[in-house]
Amino acid sequence: MDIKAAIAKVVDRKDLTTEEMIEVMQQIMTGQATPAQIGGFLVALRFKSESVGEITGAAQVMRQLASKVDIDDPHLVDTCGTGGDGSNLFNVSTAAAFVVAAAGGKVAKHGNRSVSSRSGSADVLEAAGINLDMTAEQVARAIKEIGVGFLFAPAHHSAMKHAIGPRREMGIRTIFNMLGPLTNPAGVTKQVIGVFNPLLCLPLAEVLQRLGSTHVLVVSAADGLDEISLACETHVAELKDGKISEYTLTPEDAGIMRRSLDGLTVASAEESLTLIEAALTKVTDQTSQKARDIVALNAGAAIYAADLASSFKEGVEMAQDAIGSGLAFAKLKELASFSACFKEEE
C-alpha cells in the first residue's frame, strides 16, 4: 500500500491491516516517503488511535531493519518505558537495570536520549561515565560479563533517521513512542514496559504476544507514571504462558510503604544520577529511601519477568537484597569502567 493511500484510509478512521502497515513502514524507514507524508501519516494514526495490528506491523519492520545484538540467555530482560508521562521523575527503570543484573539477570537495556523528559536513559548513563558508542559485539560482551549493557537506540535503528525530522518538528507523541520498547535489538522475549496511559497496557501486551514474547509486564500507574508507582496503585497487563491477565499492583503487595513522589523529580541528567546513586548506596534521608523503594518495586517486576522469581513480591525482596549488598551500585561502576576501555581504544 502506498503511503498516500494509507493516509486517506486512516483519515477515514479505518484501521490498516498488519500487511498494509508493514508496506507503509518500509516506505518510511527506507526513505521513500517525504517528511510531509510521514508527519501526516503519524498524526492521522494518532487521531484514529493505533490498532494492535498496526503496531505489530510497524514493530516487525523496525525489528527487521535493526542491527542485532546477539545474546542467548534464558533470563535476558529489558526495562524500557514509552516515556511521555510528563513526570520528570529520575530514571527509575535505568537504575532498576543494575539491580536486576546484581540479582542474577541479564539486562539488554534499550534506550535513547531525552525527547520529552529532563533526562533520558542515555543522558543519565553518559553522566555516569558510561560510553554509549559501543559496538553490538561490545554491548553483548558487557551483558554476558557484567549482566547489563546499554543498547543506544540510534546506533541500532539507523533507518529511524528518516522519521526523526518530522517527529521532532511536530513534538507530539506518535506510534514511535510505543515502538521503542517493542524493538529491542537483542530480541528480548521478557520485559517490563512502562506506558503513559493504562489503556495501552492490554494492546501492547497483545502486540508482544503476536511478536513471540514469553513473559511481559506492561505497567501504567494511576498517577500517570510509566513505572510502577510508589504513591498509588499500578495497572498491569501480564503476558505469561501464552495468556494475558490484567490486575492491579500496589507497593503494599511487596511489603513497601506507600509514599508520595515528592523529591524524586529532576531537572537534569546529573540530578537523576544523584538520586540513582542515593537509591543504590546508603539511605541517608526520606528522599533516598523513597528512591530506593521505587527502584526496588520496578527492579522486582523485572526480576519476576526474567523468571528469576516466582512472584512480584519475591522479585522485590531479591531486588532489596541486591541493593542492600552493594552489588547493584557495583554493577553501575563496573559498566562505566568496562565501557571506558573501548573509548580508549578508539
UniProtKB/Swiss-Prot annotation:
Cofactor remark from the record: Binds 2 magnesium ions per monomer.
The organism's place on the tree of life at top rank: Bacteria
Binding positions (anthranilate 1): G81, N112
Entry's Gene Ontology BP terms: L-tryptophan biosynthetic process
InterPro entries cross-referenced by the UniProt entry: Anthranilate_Pribosyl_Tfrase (IPR005940), Glycosyl_Trfase_fam3 (IPR000312), Glycosyl_Trfase_fam3_N_dom (IPR017459), Glycosyl_Trfase_fam3_N_dom_sf (IPR036320), Nuc_phospho_transferase (IPR035902)
Role description: Catalyzes the transfer of the phosphoribosyl group of 5-phosphorylribose-1-pyrophosphate (PRPP) to anthranilate to yield N-(5'-phosphoribosyl)-anthranilate (PRA).
The name this protein goes by in its record: Anthranilate phosphoribosyltransferase
